[in-house]
Every structure is written in structure tokens, then in C-alpha cells.
């Protein structure tokens, strides 16, 4: 097929890191995935101009090696208007109504297709991953934030405004910790990476984890330190991860019970670093499912790729350019 000669560039802008790479139409990464930190200004706002500058050399080089590039796909960790490429609300980057799609298109002279990272991830899993033959499933990401997206009756479920799926922003405690979205007590403030780090710091402050105290070496405890301690069987870290798994299971069970889903796919930085979390969520969620059929049939998998959102950003280019013929509502 003529479409086989095309490539796309995927760019995944997360809460702390940017990943990018070149893909063929079958989902194969060409060369390596490049990862750089998100540049922030003094006000802790992600600097969109520096982001564009940082990926420009890669894109220009890719044009030389892959002359038929169908476009650039952007996956971004928050609400994105996929029609005009505007990042409407990105709490972890402190963006509101940033026209990043247009800015990247103008700078790099290629078609640009932008969307939320969880939507991109679900596209990758449906086209190239474990959900190829599934019609009712959910993507869940655990990283700097917590979120998800839905695939219902063979279609992406975008919702009325295109923002469906922010499971991390259901309110669990209206007097709880402040969230980047402007609310307090959002679910992600209990289970995402910063919450795991906060729980680890509390354990160290209380003298409950000499291992995490040693690993952090006098600095603030990070999510990475908690997961390191978990893998060293530290009781405090084991308890933190167990509690996170239980809370995620409770949250997702409500979605599964409501929509009668067949599958959950979990990804994100925390899952990549601690894949055991998937098994623990699988263990707990059975207790909260309503029917015996759901308890029997629900499957929970770790994401198929090292970064499904990145793969999905590239896939979205092929879908929206009509180079892949798969009517999933992209």
C-alpha cells in the first residue's frame, strides 16, 4: 500500500518530561525515543517556546531521513481541543488556552494533530496494542497525575466538550490537598506520583522508614525513592503502594460497574517503574465489582508500550490523515 511509505512524528508532553520519536504506519519506532525535561519558567509555567525550540532540531533532522512525514502528533497531559489544537487546561504545566497546535505547525511547517495524552494512549492500544479486538475498555494513567479515557462500543468516547475521562478530578475530600486544576481533594492528589512521594516523606518524618531515609539522603522523598524502597520490601513503602492500589481499584470499579467494561489498561510513569501496582489493582478491584460476570471477565493489563501516549500521538496522525482506515471516531 502507498500509505506504507509515510512516517509520523510523535511528541508526548508530560508533567515533567517530553518524549518524541519517528514512527512508521505499523507502530514501529524508528531509531530511539528521545526524552528531555519539560522547561519551566520562573513562575513554574511550562515554556511553550522552549519546548518548540527543543524539538525543532529533531524534526528538521527527521525530515531529511524520512521525506514523507504525514505530520506531528502531540499528546499533552490535560484537556486539549483536538479540533484546533488548543491546550485548554493543563494543570501540571500551568497552561490555560495555549494554542500549541498552531504554534508548532507555524514553527515546523508540518500538519499538527494535538490531543490529550490519555486519548492518544487509548488509540495506540486499540490500533497496535493489547486492545486490538476490544470494544469496551478504559485506559488509566498513573504518573505525575491520574487520568483516563474510554473506548465504548468500538468508538473513542470524547464527551460533549471533548474532555471525557479525567477520573483523577473526581472530588474525594473537598477540604483535601490542593490540585493543579484549582480544586481541592481531587482523587489524583491521593494516588498520583506527588501523593506517593508525600506519603513517603511522612513515613520518613515519623521515623517509620529508615530505608527511604537512606535512599533520599537527606533530600525530600521522591516517588522514585518510594518505589525503590518498595522493591527492597520496605514495610512503609509496601503499605503506601498497597493503599494506592486499593484506592485506584475503588475509583475504577465505579466506572466498570457503570459501563460494563471488558478491559482496563494501565500505564504512565508510576506503572512503568512499579508494574506490580497493576496486579494489586487487579486483586482489589474484584472486591468492588457488582456482578459475577464482571468479576470473571474483566481483564487488567499493563500498557503495551514503554509510552503508549507517545505511540498514540504518532498513530493519531495516520488516523486523522486517513492513512489508516479504522473508524474509531478519531
Regions found by a protein language model. Name each.
Residues 1-71, 82-84, 102-110, 127-134, ...:
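ATP-binding/phosphotransfer module of carbohydrate and carboxylate kinases, centering on a glycine-rich
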Residues 36-39, 95, 163-166:
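A short acidic/small-residue loop/turn micro-motif
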Residues 70, 76, 152-153:
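A cytosolic small-molecule/anion-sensing beta-strand core signal
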Residues 85-96:
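A charged helix-plus-loop insertion that forms the helical arch/lid used to bind
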Residues 112-116:
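General beta-strand structural signal in soluble alpha/beta enzymes
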Residues 122:
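Acidic/histidine-rich catalytic cores of soluble enzymes
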Residues 134-191:
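Glycine-rich phosphate-binding loop of actin/hexokinase-like ATP-binding domains
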Amino acid at each position: 500500500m502507498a500509505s506504507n511509505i509515510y512516517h509520523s512524528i510523535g511528541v508526548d508532553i508530560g508533567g515533567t518530561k517530553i518524549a518524541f520519536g519517528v514512527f512508521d504506519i505499523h507502530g514501529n519506532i524508528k531509531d530511539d525515543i528521545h526524552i528531555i525535561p519539560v522547561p519551566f519558567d520562573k513562575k513554574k509555567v511550562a515554556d511553550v517556546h522552549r519546548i518548540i525550540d527543543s524539538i525543532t532540531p529533531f524534526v528538521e533532522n527527521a525530515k531529511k531521513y524520512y521525506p514523507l512525514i504525514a505530520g506531528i502528533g502531540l499528546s499533552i497531559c490535560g484537556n486539549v481541543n483536538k479540533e484546533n489544537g488548543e491546550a485548554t487546561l493543563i494543570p501540571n504545566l500551568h497552561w490555560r488556552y495555549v494554542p500549541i497546535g498552531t504554534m508548532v505547525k507555524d514553527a515546523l511547517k508540518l500538519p499538527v494533530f494535538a490531543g490529550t495524552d490519555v486519548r492518544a494512549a487509548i488509540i495506540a492500544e486499540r490500533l497496535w496494542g493489547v486492545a486490538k479486538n476490544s470494544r469496551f475498555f478504559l485506559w488509566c494513567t498513573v504518573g505525575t497525575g491520574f487520568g483516563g479515557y474510554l473506548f465504548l462500543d468500538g468508538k473513542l468516547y470524547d464527551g460533549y466538550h471533548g474532555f471525557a475521562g479525567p477520573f483523577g478530578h473526581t472530588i474525594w475530600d473537598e477540604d483535601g490537598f490542593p490540585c493543579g486544576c484549582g480544586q481541592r481533594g481531587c482523587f489524583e492528589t491521593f494516588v498520583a506520583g506527588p501523593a506517593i512521594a508525600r506519603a513517603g516523606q511522612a513515613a520518613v518524618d515519623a521515623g517509620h522508614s529508615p530505608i527511604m531515609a537512606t535512599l533520599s539522603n537527606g533530600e525530600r522523598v521522591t516517588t522514585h525513592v518510594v518505589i525503590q524502597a518498595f522493591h527492597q520490601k520496605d514495610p512503609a513503602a509496601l503499605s503506601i503502594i498497597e493503599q494506592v492500589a486499593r484506592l485506584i481499584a475503588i475509583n475504577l470499579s465505579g466506572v466498570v460497574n457503570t459501563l460494563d467494561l471488558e478491559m482496563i489498561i494501565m500505564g504512565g510513569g508510576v506503572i512503568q517503574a512499579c508494574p506490580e501496582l497493576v496486579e494489586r489493582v487487579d486483586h482489589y478491584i474484584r472486591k468492588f465489582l457488582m456482578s459475577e460476570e464482571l468479576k470473571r471477565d474483566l481483564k487488567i493489563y499493563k500498557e503495551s508500550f514503554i509510552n503508549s501516549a507517545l505511540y498514540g500521538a504518532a498513530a493519531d496522525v495516520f488516523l486523522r490523515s486517513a492513512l489508516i482506515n479504522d473508524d474509531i471516531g478519531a
